[in-house]
Amino acid sequence: LERLRDMPEVELAPVPWLHITWVRVGFLMSTDIMWSQVETFYVNAAPRLRRVEPFTLKVEGVSVADGERIYLGADDGGAFREARRHAKLGVPKVFEVLKNDPLVTAAGDTYVPRIDLGYFTGRGSRERVIEALEPFRDLVVGEVPLTHLKLARVPIQPHSHYEDIDVVAEIPMLGASHRGGYHN
């Protein structure tokens, strides 16, 4: 990241802001999602999301996508697709969102997780950034064991793109042991 920090072509996200968005539900506003609905998302999603097996996320490779973002690749073995499926079954709003998601086709969900590191600013040379990233295309960052899925609000402010992420709920992934009693 140090190679990119002083480049006018790129705005880097602060490390505490790094995350994986496994389903983007909408915007917190009266015409999309109201705050009163957020609790129902948790209540409806949690029993299903607990069924997802804990997994290890393999993080490797720096790349550029959509001509606008720089990201780390993440291999979850399909676990986030399973979480998306469970959330869709439990939460009508997620069902509606995924019904219109171009990543969900008749052949299945093609979602692949990634961790956005930064975004192009529109200034300078994109080729210069890609050249700086070339040595890191096959970078192996490591493995991260995941035991919880989070429901969070990512604040988007015009004056500050990286406000603290507001975690609304953390849901333990229990896999086959999800039937083992009360979990809240």
Segments (PLM) and residue ranges:
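Histidine-dependent nucleotide/RNA phosphoesterase domain, centered on the 2H-phosphoesterase fold
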Residues: 1-184
